[in-house]
Amino acid sequence: MKASLLNKLEILQDRFEELTALLGDAEVISDQTRFRAYSREYAEVEPVYAAYKEWRKVQDDLEGAQALLKDSDPDLREMAVEEVREAKEQLLTLEAQLQRMLLPKDPNDGRNVFLEIRAGTGGDEAAIFSGDLFRMYSRYAEKRGWRLEILSENEGEHGGYKEIIARVEGENVYGKLKFESGAHRVQRVPETESQGRVHTSACTVAVLPEPDEQAAIEINPADLRVDTYRASGAGGQHVNKTDSAIRITHLPTGIVVECQEERSQHKNRARAMSWLSAKLNDMQTSAAQNALASERKLLVGSGDRSERIRTYNYPQGRVTDHRINLTLYSLDDILSGGVDAVIEPLLAEYQADQLAALGD
């Protein structure tokens, strides 16, 4: 094991022993805020400590078995050879486990998200493809047991959406969708194309983690312009009776968010404010993420909205993710919600990238 990793594990062991003592301290027990904080940290550290303790035990066993290889008794030497082999296999498994455990956790992985899909180049065809992407993510959300609600939609003239914004709620939503941000390109023959020529269109996808109250940016009400208007689209007759839709403009940045799907103006405002907070958070963190990506030459995860990340080629039934040079000939399955076929290799590549940086 690398010396840098061993050093991290030694520090973690010291912290585990410190936490054990703190959680038995009467003063800490009487302070519920500190006790809860230390308990959470203990729960995170304890599995790593247990794996490291096991690694040290196997390391000792290996050294003992290696010493027996020099014994004069041939039976003992034969037994030691097998013990050395088993110990080395166990050490490799434990080292890989410890490396994964030491990977930095993304605090946003467990958060819900705001999913933004916008038609780019390609006019009507781009809007239709936005609808295809939205259906793909909707089916994926359904498969994972997530809840998806549309906040705002601007339908295309010939189907699909010029823009559609949704909130996705569930377990590990951002952790799964965070690498979907970027430009998605489609190559296919439009229905209106009489010559059978393949056209190329594009849409942009943005996945923003929904901040909790602690992480939310404090927004000065004086920086906001709030407009109400009558909702259009889904909702039946009710939508034309009240000005329930909300449009909020953040004056310092020019960011505009709209929510029109709830019948209650209060609910629409709450959703819009949460979405605005997510967009402001994203502005704040994206610069730092881009700097990190360029510094470490990250293969995936830059989150650049203009970066072409994926191509969907209909004539060939092909999906290519350009960040990891992954090509799959299962377009229909992926568009039907089987996005894990692309997401899982991306996550594996990102984890490998983190592991490579861990020992630096």
Curated annotation (Swiss-Prot):
The keyword Cytoplasm applies. One of its GO terms (cellular component) is cytoplasm. It is found in: Cytoplasm. It comes from the Bacteria. Keywords: Cytoplasm, Methylation, Protein biosynthesis. Methylated by PrmC. Methylation increases the termination efficiency of RF1. The keyword Cytoplasm applies. GO terms for molecular function: translation release factor activity, codon specific. Its main location: cytoplasm. Pfam families: PCRF, RF-1. The modification N5-methylglutamine is found at Q237. NCBIfam families: prfA, PRK00591.1. Peptide chain release factor 1 directs the termination of translation in response to the peptide chain termination codons UAG and UAA. Belongs to the prokaryotic/mitochondrial release factor family. This is Peptide chain release factor 1.
